[in-house]
C-alpha cells in the first residue's frame, strides 16, 4: 500500500506579520481610549471636592453672611483639602472679602491625573465652572465638567 504524503500546511510568515500588525493597531486604539476614560473617572474626584466646597460655602454664607476662607480647619471644616481619592487639592481665593470666592481643585503633582489636559478645575460663588465647555484646548480628552 502506497501512502500519500500530505503536505503539512501552516501559516506563512507574512500571514503572522499581518495578524501581529492588526493586534498592535487595536492595542494602541484601546490604550488611548482607556487613558481617556481613566482621566475622566479621576476628574470626577476633583469635581466632587469642588461641589462639597461649594455646598459648605453656601451653608457658611447662610449663617454668617460671608464666604469662608479655610476649607480644612477654619470656616468650612471639610476635614481635608485633598479629595477623597487623593488626586486633587483645593484652594479658596476670595476677590471680595464677603461677596465672592473661587475654589480651585488642582491635580496633585506626581500622580497620573497631573497629565490631564483639563488641568485645574474651578467653581466660583456664581456657580461658573471652569474650564468651560467652549474651551477647546482644555476639553481635548473629554468634557472637563
Regions found by a protein language model. Give the residues of each.
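N-terminal leader/signal peptides at the extreme start of proteins
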Residues: 1-11
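Periplasmic/extracellular, small/polar-rich flexible segments of pilin-like filament-forming proteins
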Residues: 62-145
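Conserved G/P- and acidic residue-centered "switch" motifs that form tight phosphate/ATP-binding loops
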Residues: 10-15, 32, 53
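Residue-level signal for short amphipathic helical patches enriched in basic/charged
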Residues: 8, 26-29, 41-44
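Membrane-proximal N-terminal amphipathic helix
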Residues: 39-66
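Alpha-helical hydrophobic helix detector
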Residues: 16-33
